Design a protein with these regions (language model features):
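Polytopic transmembrane helical bundles with strong interfacial aromatic enrichment
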Residues: 1-173
């Protein structure tokens, strides 16, 4: 795992990948889960972006642990703000996994079934996708929205705690 990139701590650079891709993956997931036209247009891109975001989380977290060990006397002498940021950062991986799993599930279900908000017809034509009951589509959408909102909220909490750790007590200007 990289600890420095061009002389800078890797965490401060890699975090931008997570900051950008988690919300994008979450937005794509919600759009795909609730809007069939978006799901058709986005296709495999939604789980692909979610997978890259998921892969970036542990790499960034590990780089953050390295940075934590090298800040202000090592991990044993950290101020509470840095410890809080590290603790919150460790909680993002389950949300990233949830976003990826739901993105993959919505993509697979969308390819195999007609995930629309209309009731299923009594008969289907040969060669058409079988329509799932509306309640299944609704459950998938609710779970997709829940993991997306949870992941973005956790990301904001992590970012805020990191900014507080870095900038508290400092002035600009």
């Amino acid at each position: 795992m990289p600890t420095k990139i061009n002389g800078l701590p890797a965490h401060v650079l890699l975090i931008h990948v997570v900051i950008v891709l988690i919300p994008i993956a979450a937005l794509m997931l919600v759009a795909s889960a609730v809007w069939p036209a978006a799901r058709a247009k986005l296709g495999f891109l939604t789980p692909a972006v979610a997978l890259v975001a998921l892969a970036a989380v542990p790499v960034t977290t590990n780089a953050g642990h390295w940075l934590q060990d090298h800040l202000r006397g090592g991990a044993g002498h950290q101020d509470p703000a840095i410890l809080r940021h590290a603790h919150l950062g460790g909680q993002l991986l389950p949300w990233a996994i949830g976003i990826f799993v739901m993105a993959a599930a919505v993509w697979v279900l969308g390819r195999r079934f007609d995930l629309t908000w209309r009731p299923a017809p009594a008969t289907t034509e040969e060669g058409t996708l079988r329509r799932l009951p509306v309640w299944i589509t609704a459950v998938v959408a609710v779970i997709a929205i829940a993991v997306s909102v949870g992941g973005v909220v956790q990301l904001v909490r992590i970012g805020d705690s990191g900014a507080q750790a870095e900038w508290s007590g400092r002035t600009v200007g």
